[in-house]
């Protein structure tokens, strides 16, 4: 089965100290270089519940009521980008599905993004990223935090940028 997502040939997937498996640089990655493109099927929040019940979390949010991800167990592995959450990430979002380096990344570094760049939901989780500026608890509403909006300017999902403009006039 063909892969649904693209991972840069400068990366590899291996065990992560953050959680499960992660995406790691095998070669130097330059700022704004594409490191992953999330692929899959487009579905709404109602369908998301059924997909998550069957596959667990394997999607990313691309609109207020739109998600992209696998629909079957066979597609799950090939749709993953293996980017764990970090409160001090080194990759961010351009558009809705393209992940790029926010700075130069050295070989051996784990590629991480902050879920505040992509998620708008009611979830909450204890953070284990280990960053010096770790928020300890990550929520699906963190995108509303002014400090994160400023920190991730240019690296947040398009739909969140639009929501910020509507809600906060930015």
What label would you give each PLM region?
Residues 2-91:
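Catalytic cores of histone-lysine modification enzymes
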Residues 85-170:
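C-terminal SET catalytic tail plus cysteine-rich post-SET Zn-binding segment of SAM-dependent SET-domain
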């Amino acid at each position: 089965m063909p892969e649904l997502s693209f991972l840069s040939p400068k990366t590899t997937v291996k065990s992560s100290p953050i959680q499960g498996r992660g995406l790691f640089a095998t070669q130097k990655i330059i700022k704004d270089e594409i490191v992953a493109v999330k692929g899959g099927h487009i579905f709404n929040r109602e369908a998301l519940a059924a997909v998550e019940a069957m596959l667990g979390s394997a999607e990313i949010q691309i609109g207020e009521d739109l998600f992209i991800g696998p629909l079957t167990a066979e597609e799950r592995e090939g749709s993953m980008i293996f980017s764990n959450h970090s409160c001090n990430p080194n990759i961010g979002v351009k558009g809705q599905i393209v992940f790029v380096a926010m700075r130069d990344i050295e070989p051996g570094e784990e590629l991480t993004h902050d879920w505040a760049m992509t998620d708008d939901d009611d979830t909450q989780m204890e953070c284990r990223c280990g960053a010096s500026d770790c928020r300890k608890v990550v929520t699906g509403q963190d995108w509303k935090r002014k400090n994160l909006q400023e920190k991730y300017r240019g690296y947040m999902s398009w739909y969140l940028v639009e929501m910020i403009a509507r809600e906060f006039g930015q």
